[in-house]
A protein has these predicted regions:
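C-terminal segment of classical bacterial N-terminal signal peptides
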Residues: 14-22
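N-terminal secretory-pathway/extracellular module detecting exported/lumenal segments
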Residues: 23-292
Length: 292
């Protein structure tokens, strides 16, 4: 009898310590696919790890975790192996079939972290693992945007995925278009999915395109900004720049991180007016998940 109890205890312990993703009952929800990748997440795995109580008594999640799955074509596997710098471990992309990842999300700062990643071959054997990846902010150029939106929507139901997948004219807000003396046309748009209001500062990502007189794109700026809507000032917090002669490079802020005044004769002033109007008309959206 004691032997049976001991064996039962071993079995229970084994089941208890099985990784979450090893469970046969895992139901993966499809998010998106292209020629390289297919992305899934498991709604039942979404867990609120931390939350705070605001001054008005609301409980707001500030840390959420969930499991995701990515499957790879040959091209996707090759790209992933190169990006992770593991060619010495996986020289043949055919040996990478899919990966499972535990993601940690902070909705207030729109950030995501890979807590754990396990990479598998077609025989469901782990070929490489990685833990505690860097924390990164999610924007329109992020590979993980679908994951972020699905996980946050599972908790808050604010329509992150719908806005992410909306037509361009619904997701992107045109701020201004300007033609300079050389005949270059510059257009600036704001990604409404990234907008969040912190006090009087609107945090957002903007996409600026410059085309020459022939209509050829010669420069693209992708910028994270903080715009003080009350004072009429702004600062570039992060960004990248692309030119027709160089690939993407880090965008350096000419003001060394200081806020600059937006003057009434600047093209950006028209953008400031549009941002103020957008915030006024979409207060629930820009204040979603806010702790203020």
């Amino acid at each position: 009898m004691q032997k049976k109890i001991f064996l039962l205890a071993i079995i229970c312990a084994t089941v208890f310590f099985l990784p979450h993703y090893a469970c046969a009952e895992t139901q993966w929800f499809w998010l998106d696919s292209n020629d390289k990748y297919s992305k899934y997440f498991e709604p039942d795995s979404v867990t609120i790890k931390k939350k705070v109580v605001t001054s008005d008594g609301k409980e707001i999640a500030i840390e959420i975790e969930a499991w995701t799955k990515t499957t790879y074509s040959y091209e996707g596997a090759s790209e992933t192996i190169k990006n992770y710098g593991i060619t010495n471990i996986l020289p043949d992309p055919k040996n990478l079939a899919y990966s499972l990842a535990l993601l940690r999300v902070n909705p207030q700062n729109r950030t995501l972290q890979y807590v754990r990643e396990d990479f598998y071959n077609a025989a469901h054997q782990v070929v490489w693992s990685k833990e505690e990846g860097r924390v990164k902010e999610i924007n329109s150029r992020s590979f993980d945007e679908e994951f972020y939106c699905a996980i946050v929507d599972e908790v808050f139901r604010m329509g992150e995925r719908d806005r992410k997948r909306a037509p361009r004219e619904e997701r992107w807000l045109d701020l201004w278009t300007y033609t300079d003396d050389a005949g270059n046309t510059i257009n600036l748009t704001a990604d409404t999915t990234t907008m969040r209001l912190k006090g009087t500062n609107l945090i957002l990502w903007e996409w600026q395109t410059k085309k020459d007189s022939r209509g050829q794109t010669v420069e693209i700026r992708f910028m994270k900004k903080s715009v003080n809507l009350t004072q009429g000032t702004e600062v570039i917090k992060d960004g990248q720049i692309w030119t027709s002669t160089n690939s993407w490079q880090e965008l350096k802020d000419d003001y060394d991180g200081a806020y600059r005044m937006i003057h009434s004769d600047d093209p950006d002033y028209k953008g400031l007016v549009r941002l103020r109007a957008y915030v006024k008309n979409n207060s629930n959206w820009v204040s979603r998940y806010s702790l203020d």
